[in-house]
């Protein structure tokens, strides 16, 4: 099946706010390295940072509410380490088409597979995926469904089978029940993520909190799909390698939660601890994450390519 590729819809190129946000993020030079395009009938927005056709390829899924342009320094830096890097704006997020914030985990898995169909026409592989925050859950779900993904790096992995505490579990149950009656009712993101506090001290904090491309309100059916998804890694070992990248000062989920996830899941998970850093480290310290992610992916891809030769 041929997947349609179209030019991107970069809707804010002449916007003063967009220019100011990029300046505060200091990403103007990194954006010169990207090639943007849309994939499929759902117009999935992708941003490619190419290294070479025979280099390994990493797909990136951003954190909740956000989109991949905000992570340009991270994606460009990772590419310069020897990888083709492709950021995907989730359906209804950033520059991707669709009702704002509206997707299911299954739809995102399909979107990742469509993008892989396109990438395979240009790049030899191997292919890995890096998901940050809620993007980590989506990355893991995508790898469970698509065996082309041989390495999965999760920036703080939420596994809904394992609630951090009873308050989370009650909230998820409420979300599920409410979504049956009011699936399109939107819940403010600030009810469970305080961007202003998490980005405290970042030069672009105010701009990010006012960015029209960020999703600040989520339909209940999206939240229900995310927080009630059942990860297959809980009861099954997959062929892909996997790791959790977690700051020891994480304000959203404590480091102890990742240790619980590792002991609960049948899937082997490596833990990479980011010392003295919190949840927003990919935006706050992108160069640090570039080094850690590049080292891990290089190790996994090298093993895979060595095994392929034997």
Model-derived features: where do they sit?
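Alpha/beta-hydrolase-fold enzymes
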Residues: 132-212, 216-217
